[in-house]
Design a protein with these regions (language model features):
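Condensing-enzyme catalytic core mediating Claisen C-C bond formation in acyl metabolism
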Residues: 1-27, 146, 232-298, 302, ...
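Conserved catalytic cysteine-centered active-site region
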Residues: 25, 57-112, 145-148, 158-164, ...
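Active-site pocket-lining segment
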Residues: 55, 169, 202-205, 213, ...
């Protein structure tokens, strides 16, 4: 019988706003924080036996450029014998890291893994390419925070290089997602986060971060700072379309540009017993799919269908559905295609990325983490986690409470 992969612990930083509380922390230092928290919460683990660290990171042009997973392990104080590798499936990187770690354990090639993701969009650098020829006076500078750079002309000709908000407007147009429905979706995200925060539902998954001050004691940062739980429909309706006044995607019904890191401790049953760990969830399976880049936000729909077919499970069996809210338009296009109601209580019951934020390489790991704790709070069995990915992909993963 093949071994199973169990999530034994999962923890994340609070998510910071662009230029906010976490913006003063180097990306590699940020990546180390949840690993340090895992080490502190699990003192019985022999950390020398961790087979690998797999981290997702979408940028990798700045302080995250030299294999940030390896950097994170060293900076966290793990033994030098513990290796690390960084994955890049853009927005899906963190989820891909978790699924890949689980696959290694299921294959019998590893017994104890750390997986997660990091992104500091605040600290994403500007980059400049070399000139095509000597003494050329041409130059270009790209902001690597999000979106296209170093554009391939053939890619542009064949598929277009629409910005992320443009792809969301493409989805809204193609699937006829009304502005009012997008704003209502965004409002639910904010309100559900507000209720979850008030009930203390994020305490188990968030590791407070100490922020050094110029004078006095460090500031303790322990709450996501992107949410706006007092948002109203009237306020959302006043916002202008990002891509033009006649279009429907706005700053209010889109996810944020954010900073954060997340790490999960994943083990086989035997390793969990050896290290005194209590399995919390089983990694059931993961699947990916491709769609046209111009409607990249629709990617979760085929990924979810592929995953359900692969596992023999149904949407009706899912007790929690964590759908990354890159944009309300794409979220609604996906849920409607899957036959789900817009206000299905299983979808992002504690709010989603429109409220919480979307640090690209971290978000997938955050979805799995949040889903796991929600299953334990409610006694549910299965959770489906899924997200869209730039350049036209989707990823989905199912976990089971144990």
């Amino acid at each position: 019988m093949n071994p199973q992969a169990f999530i034994c612990d999962a923890i994340r930083t609070p998510i910071g706003r662009y230029g906010g509380t976490l913006s003063g922390i180097r990306t590699d230092d940020l990546a180390a924080l949840p690993i340090k928290a895992l080490m502190a919460r699990n003192p019985g683990v022999n950390w020398e036996l961790v087979e690998d660290i797999i981290y997702g990171c979408a940028n990798q042009a700045g302080e995250d450029n030299r294999n940030v997973a390896r950097m994170a392990g060293l900076l966290a104080g793990l033994p030098v014998a513990v290796p690390g590798t960084t994955m890049n499936r853009l927005c899906g990187s963190g989820m891909d890291a978790v699924g890949t770690a689980a696959r290694a354990i299921k294959a019998g090639e590893a017994a104890l893994m750390i997986a997660g993701g990091v992104e500091s969009m605040s600290r994403a650098p500007f980059v400049m390419p070399k000139a095509d020829s000597a003494f050329s006076r041409s130059n270009a500078v790209y902001d690597t925070t999000i979106g296209w750079r170093f554009i391939n002309k053939l890619m542009k000709q064949q598929y277009g290089v629409d910005s992320m908000p443009e792809t969301a407007d493409n989805v809204a147009a193609e699937f006829r997602i009304a502005r009012t429905d997008q704003d209502a979706f965004a409002l639910r995200s904010q309100q559900r986060w507000g209720a979850a925060h008030a009930a203390g539902r994020f305490k188990d998954e968030i590791a407070p971060v100490e922020i050094a001050q110029k004078k006095g004691d460090p500031k303790i940062f322990d709450t996501d700072e992107h949410p706006r739980p007092d948002t109203t429909l009237e306020q959302l309706a006043k916002l202008k379309g990002i891509n033009g006044p006649e279009l429907t995607v706005t700053a209010g019904n889109a996810s944020g540009v954010n900073d954060g890191a997340c790490a999960l401790l994943i083990a086989s049953a035997a390793a969990a017993k050896t290290h005194g760990l209590t399995p919390k969830a089983r990694g059931v399976a993961m699947a990916t799919a491709g769609v046209a880049p111009r409607i990249m936000g629709f990617g979760p729909a085929p990924a979810v269908k592929k995953l359900l077919a692969q596992t023999g499970l149904t949407l009706a069996q899912m007790d929690v559905i964590e759908l990354n809210e890159a944009f309300a338009a794409q979220g609604l296009a996906v849920t409607r295609d899957l036959g789900l109601a817009d206000d299905d209580a299983r979808i992002n019951p504690n709010g989603g990325a429109i409220a919480i934020g979307h640090p690209l390489g971290m978000s997938g790991a955050r979805l799995v983490t949040t889903a796991m704790y929600q299953l334990h709070r409610t006694g549910g069995r299965y959770a489906l986690c899924t997200m869209c990915i730039g350049v036209g992909q989707g990823i989905a993963m199912i976990i089971e409470r144990v």
